[in-house]
Amino acid sequence: MGGMAEHTQLIDAINIRTAVRAYDDEPIDDDTARQLEMALQPINLLGDLNIQLVRDQPKVFAEANASGHLTNAANYLAIVGPANDEEAKERAGFYAERMVLTATLRGLGTLWVAGSWDKAEAAKHCRVTSGQELYLGVVIGHPKNHLDYQAKSYEELCEAQRTHRATKTYEQFTATMSDEGREAAPDWFKSGVEAAMKAPSAMNRPPITFSYNPADDTAAAHIDQSAEDEHHAFNDMGIAKLHFQIGAGQGQWDLLDGGLFIHK
């Protein structure tokens, strides 16, 4: 049984990440905060975003903490970017989820939040310049009983991920494809979809589907119109595309609905 030490890849993080709603009340220390902020710099640069780490603001989650929906939520990544910009919202999902996976490898828990926080209160504690908006947030902190969590092996954490929630099936994630098409798709596509199946969603219902086009050996991502999640669909698409890209191994996405993935 391998411990977590040798599991340093983003695909390892995908295999163990779960939505964490209960946290220990131990704060994120300055050293960890510094490391997270260092990891944020290139992400903000690449994504043209303004994602910020905010610590020790339990008031933002007062209602969710009081109702028991969350426990001890107090820190968050404020996902800030250009206002009214669908491409930027997708980039925010893609790059902020990279931070989520980085935090996962550090033993921290995370949860994407769109509804279960006081957004106006959250905005008070971060910089939102004119022309920018606070899209949504990611709760971050030490998972409840985090010493027990850290003592678990990679295999145990993978097993916990597998049984964490009912996920949509591979068929649902490739809804527009025929059985023959699924069968004929290359391994990199299947691995990409499997990684995307493990992606979180701001609204807890992934509205993204993938398809493979054998004619030019590309994949495409689509917003599932039946999911009725217009508001955060582009954010969720960015999250799912990052997972797909890591699972597929090599390649690059075009942005937006119907964007193509070219496998290298």
Locate predicted features.
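Acidic, surface-exposed loops and disordered segments
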Residues: 1-264
